[in-house]
Amino acid sequence: MDLKTVLSLPRYPGEFLHPVVYACTAVMLLCLLASFVTYIVHQSAIRISRKGRHTLLNFCFHAALTFTVFAGGINRTKYPILCQAVGIVLHYSTLSTMLWIGVTARNIYKQVTKKAPLCLDTDQPPYPRQPLLRFYLVSGGVPFIICGVTAATNIRNYGTEDEDTAYCWMAWEPSLGAFYGPAAIITLVTCVYFLGTYVQLRRHPGRRYELRTQPEEQRRLATPEGGRGIRPGTPPAHDAPGASVLQNEHSFQAQLRAAAFTLFLFTATWAFGALAVSQGHFLDMVFSCLYGAFCVTLGLFVLIHHCAKREDVWQCWWACCPPRKDAHPALDANGAALGRAACLHSPGLGQPRGFAHPPGPCKMTNLQAAQGHASCLSPATPCCAKMHCEPLTADEAHVHLQEEGAFGHDPHLHGCLQGRTKPPYFSRHPAEEPEYAYHIPSSLDGSPRSSRTDSPPSSLDGPAGTHTLACCTQGDPFPMVTQPEGSDGSPALYSCPTQPGREAALGPGHLEMLRRTQSLPFGGPSQNGLPKGKLLEGLPFGTDGTGNIRTGPWKNETTV
């Protein structure tokens, strides 16, 4: 054994690659797998076109196949048949991945340059649904033909070129025409699509989102009450396109940047991986680290752009998580936990805040309040509950609100919390106030009650012909004690605050009733749950000699 053989270093990569290659490849595979599974499981809930979903799924699959075979078999030179198979798979998957990126660029360009349909009132869609087989024939068939011709010409074109080659790939001369030439053409055509899309977006700044054409029947159903509940001259709620008509949540500019950056990351990762297994002992470590950095960047970019930056994907992810148990369950009037959790229901995205029943009076009995059908009494946070309304009867206590016009629609929830020391008063102009009838609810035996389950605060705000009742609970400094018969205490009062800039938009029919709580300057609470002393003297509404409560402009009385 001569000195040269003793001092010579083993040829790289040897039996194993640098550890950073395996670690970073595993991270990228996890990111691609998460994106792939998300778009497979929740394909009906994610707003993306059919072409975009297929191109993304195929890109994730072929990119994962490319780097998995690279990390696991690029240095298996001791097994000739396995080495040839690794070279064939790398050849096919690399060209297929680049072609799927090119198909993505082509689809973006077609969407940007697509003209608006001439007729929207026909039952047939203006653009027929085209099959996706052509994309699979191009992105999967072309690489298959190239690999088949190369292998049929000479199977030894794959594998190790000679004994000194330490990686499984292709011979140099066949690779020029079978791989590097087609890869360069694909990259050039893809860049031309990118440039054309960029020019079109600069010339037409208004083309920002990919919209989905809706049939006439769906457009009529999307209009509130078939187009009858909209006031004439009412401006649209917002200028941006609605979520129901978006074909893709990302804009064209975001899709263009993502496709271009994906092509750059994939090309750079592949190049650094090839240099990591073909260079000397020191450069292999440098290029292995560069390969790992770009590999992780590619996986994280795909996961962040296509999943983490999309609201619909986040909704799908949260829907898969088990719901948390309420740490503070709602209690009824007797202190028992309520079995019904439907009171914590909140309106979903795009749903009107109201009930689909004809306009009519709404009533709430004490029995329903005690059973938990009327309000939510969560001691932690206020909640907004939906209550079913029934026709008004003459022998039951109720809260009757009669309006002359239609309610204005407000898609946002009202703020429920108000200050204790500054209770809101009626500030609506008398000329704008419709006629309201407020009746103090009574118990089942006819005696008035002061519990907050008897007369919950409510807020009415919804489209025409609908009512929305939201209970807004606050910390009550008074104990929940039923008022005995013959007591001279008065039940709690409610007020209607107004918010600047909202009264004109909501219309005269808007009424928001909140519980009025005050400090106790005249003494502590009595046994009936109300403060002692002459606290009622400072209230805007007093009582007459017969014990009736006068409620200001309503002039309705309830005899105790």
UniProtKB/Swiss-Prot annotation:
GO terms for cellular component: glutamatergic synapse; membrane; plasma membrane; postsynaptic density. Glycans are attached at residue 75. Residues 41-53, 106-134, 197-257, 306-560 are cytoplasmic. The keyword Acyltransferase does not apply. It is found in: Membrane. The keyword Ubl conjugation does not apply. Residues 447-459, 529-542 have a biased composition (Low complexity). Residues 210-222 have a biased composition (Basic and acidic residues). One of its GO terms (biological process) is cell surface receptor signaling pathway. Residues 210-242, 438-473, 521-560 are annotated as: Disordered. It is a multi-pass membrane protein. Residues 1-19, 75-84, 156-175, 279-284 are extracellular. GO terms for molecular function: G protein-coupled receptor activity. Keywords: G-protein coupled receptor, Glycoprotein, Membrane, Receptor, Transducer, Transmembrane, Transmembrane helix. The chain crosses the membrane at residues 20-40, 54-74, 85-105, 135-155, 176-196, 258-278, 285-305. PROSITE patterns: G_PROTEIN_RECEP_F2_2, G_PROTEIN_RECEP_F2_4. Orphan receptor. Belongs to the G-protein coupled receptor 2 family. Adhesion G-protein coupled receptor (ADGR) subfamily. This is Adhesion G protein-coupled receptor A1. It comes from Homo sapiens (Human). The lineage of its organism: Eukaryota, Metazoa, Chordata, Craniata, Vertebrata.
